[in-house]
Amino acid sequence: MADFDDRVSDEEKVRIAAKFITHAPPGEFNEVFNDVRLLLNNDNLLREGAAHAFAQYNMDQFTPVKIEGYEDQVLITEHGDLGNSRFLDPRNKISFKFDHLRKEASDPQPEEADGGLKSWRESCDSALRAYVKDHYSNGFCTVYAKTIDGQQTIIACIESHQFQPKNFWNGRWRSEWKFTITPPTAQVVGVLKIQVHYYEDGNVQLVSHKDVQDSLTVSNEAQTAKEFIKIIENAENEYQTAISENYQTMSDTTFKALRRQLPVTRTKIDWNKILSYKIGKEMQNA
């Protein structure tokens, strides 16, 4: 370890640590952080040098957070980043301080940031909330209204996760949808992401994403929001169905081809009871 410390600079150590952290599977940030902390063995260096990695991880993962005094959770995303660790909750019209390590919100303050698009944002938010409630058992969403390069833009973010560490798996769904308010038609751009980690007696990850483009008729706020959600629903249903079908095909073909055939005896070896077999006893005596 001494030779390693001599050869690798603190800057390089932090870069490696940050890489591990930003690639932590969903629901396993704390485990990865604690392992990296032990390897680096320098808390001050880790906290100061890798702080950007904590923030990047939470924004990339659309981490949901509950703000005390408010019912709905809000997503931590780059679209709500106000700087200095403050984030926007457009639904509740507040900003708040977010601790990227503890994943806790504090100091809520009034904040108006809909770019004069209040009715558009609220219509899309209301429709998206209903959709997420119907389709995701543990889903959250946040809708932003911003002016980007002179274009009035609606951005919708969806997150849903299932963390089952006792059963050795964790998974997260993320999707992001955008359209500009440019009558009579607008282009809808979406990106869908799935990440699942299974680690019982092995280490398997499913990482998948899909880019989507569609067109949207822009009329009044309510009707446009309805059509926007319909596009989201169709694309996400199609993607999830394709993932399921592809996974089944892989299970029936690719994974099956990797399995070791049964021995001539047509009997599987119970490796947990190997000592009870004759070969096990012979090895033990040897």
Swiss-Prot record:
This is F-actin-capping protein subunit alpha-1. PROSITE patterns: F_ACTIN_CAPPING_A_1, F_ACTIN_CAPPING_A_2. The modification Phosphoserine is found at residue 9. Component of the F-actin capping complex, composed of a heterodimer of an alpha and a beta subunit. Subunit of dynactin, a multiprotein complex part of a tripartite complex with dynein and a adapter, such as BICDL1, BICD2 or HOOK3. The dynactin complex is built around ACTR1A/ACTB filament and consists of an actin-related filament composed of a shoulder domain, a pointed end and a barbed end. Its length is defined by its flexible shoulder domain. The soulder is composed of 2 DCTN1 subunits, 4 DCTN2 and 2 DCTN3. Keywords: Acetylation, Actin capping, Actin-binding, Cytoplasm, Cytoskeleton, Phosphoprotein. GO terms for molecular function: actin binding; actin filament binding; cadherin binding. GO terms for cellular component: actin cytoskeleton; cortical cytoskeleton; cytoskeleton; cytosol; extracellular exosome; extracellular region; F-actin capping protein complex; WASH complex. The keyword Phosphoprotein applies. Its main location: cytoplasm. InterPro entries: CapZ_alpha, CapZ_alpha/beta, CapZ_alpha/beta_2, CapZ_alpha_1, F-actin_cap_asu_CS. It comes from Homo sapiens. It is found in: Cytoplasm, Cytoskeleton. The modification N-acetylalanine is found at residue 2. GO terms for biological process: actin cytoskeleton organization; barbed-end actin filament capping; cell junction assembly; protein-containing complex assembly. The keyword Cytoplasm applies. The gene is CAPZA1. F-actin-capping proteins bind in a Ca(2+)-independent manner to the fast growing ends of actin filaments (barbed end) thereby blocking the exchange of subunits at these ends. Unlike other capping proteins (such as gelsolin and severin), these proteins do not sever actin filaments. May play a role in the formation of epithelial cell junctions. Forms, with CAPZB, the barbed end of the fast growing ends of actin filaments in the dynactin complex and stabilizes dynactin structure. Pfam families: F-actin_cap_A. Belongs to the F-actin-capping protein alpha subunit family. The modification N6-acetyllysine is found at residues 19, 97.
